Swiss-Prot record:
CDD domains: Cyt_c_Oxidase_III. The chain crosses the membrane at residues 16-34, 41-66, 73-105, 129-152, 156-183, 191-223, 233-256. It comes from Papio hamadryas. GO terms for cellular component: mitochondrial inner membrane; respiratory chain complex IV. Residues 1-15, 67-72, 153-155, 224-232 are mitochondrial matrix. Component of the cytochrome c oxidase (complex IV, CIV), a multisubunit enzyme composed of 14 subunits. The complex is composed of a catalytic core of 3 subunits MT-CO1, MT-CO2 and MT-CO3, encoded in the mitochondrial DNA, and 11 supernumerary subunits COX4I, COX5A, COX5B, COX6A, COX6B, COX6C, COX7A, COX7B, COX7C, COX8 and NDUFA4, which are encoded in the nuclear genome. One of its GO terms (molecular function) is cytochrome-c oxidase activity. This is Cytochrome c oxidase subunit 3. It is a multi-pass membrane protein. The gene is MT-CO3. One of its GO terms (biological process) is mitochondrial electron transport, cytochrome c to oxygen. Its main location: mitochondrion. Disulfide bonds: none annotated. It comes from the Eukaryota.
């Protein structure tokens, strides 16, 4: 048995970043195949690879943090820095979509009819379904904060209740967003308006699904007594991510749904 004289976790070689990158490649390629050729084989393979990667990577992290005790205080501090940098990178990722939207909408070209929305586009009413979804996400932000405070106070029952409500709200948001896509009077192929609308809101919807999955894992871990008031970075990271998703949606709602209409 080896002994270490420092508090840092020396991570062993892991195949999951490689399989995660492979699954991302398969998913993007599969989406292209689905859009252009209506073939779902590559997309299904990408989804399967992604699910297997997530399961095994989460399994390893839970083993290292909960059962082997590798997530010491210095390690948790480094993980917080890493999560902060990841969220900052996501901010720049979405900044590109907002840039594309405002670049096109603030100075519309003659091809767009010199006005925004472009000629022939009927935008969605921001005071109907989009406002409902905004209320749902804001409510989920309240419930995830409730879950965090309950966990910090050692109230296991309320933590489980609040997490479950947050997951249900996230699922409801996703279902409403899907129904909105089906009922929208324009498509992703309807010029720059359709492209920016569906790509920006679609990637946000993907982040909601990822965040809901993250919170579902936290709920399962809470049921198995993995979290304590002083050791729950997995939950903390999920909560940060969920608040980030909330804030991005507010900017999307104000920019694309309200001002853009």
């Amino acid at each position: 048995m080896t002994h270490q004289l420092h508090a840092y976790h020396m991570v062993k070689p892991s195949p999951w970043p490689l399989t995660g990158a492979l699954s991302a490649f398969l998913l993007t390629s599969g989406l292209i195949m689905w859009f252009h050729f209506y073939s779902t084989a590559l997309l299904t393979l990408g989804l399967l690879t992604n699910v297997l990667t997530m399961y095994q990577w989460w399994r390893d992290i839970i083993r290292e943090s909960t059962y082997q005790g590798h997530h010491t205080t210095p390690v948790q501090k480094s993980l917080r820095y890493g999560m902060t940098l990841f969220i900052i990178s996501e901010v720049f990722f979405f900044a590109g979509f907002f840039w594309a939207f405002y670049h096109s909408s603030l100075a519309p070209t003659p091809r767009l009819g010199c006005h925004w929305p472009p000629t022939g586009i009927t935008p969605l009413n921001p005071l109907e379904v989009p406002l409902l979804n905004t209320s749902v996400l804001l409510a989920s932000g309240v419930t995830i904060t409730w879950a965090h405070h309950s966990l910090m106070n050692g109230n296991r029952k309320q933590t489980i209740q609040a997490l479950l409500i947050t997951i249900l709200l996230g699922t409801y948001f996703t279902l409403v967003q899907i129904s909105e896509y089906f009922e929208a009077p324009f498509t992703i192929s309807d010029g720059i308006y359709g492209s920016t609308f569906f790509v920006a809101t679609g990637f946000h919807g993907l982040h909601v699904i990822i965040g809901s999955t993250f919170l579902l894992i936290c709920l399962i871990r809470q049921l198995f007594y993995h979290f304590t008031p002083s050791h729950h970075f997995g939950f903390e990271a999920a909560a940060w991510y969920w608040h980030f998703v909330d804030v991005i949606w507010l900017f999307l709602y104000i920019s694309i749904y309200w001002w853009g209409s």
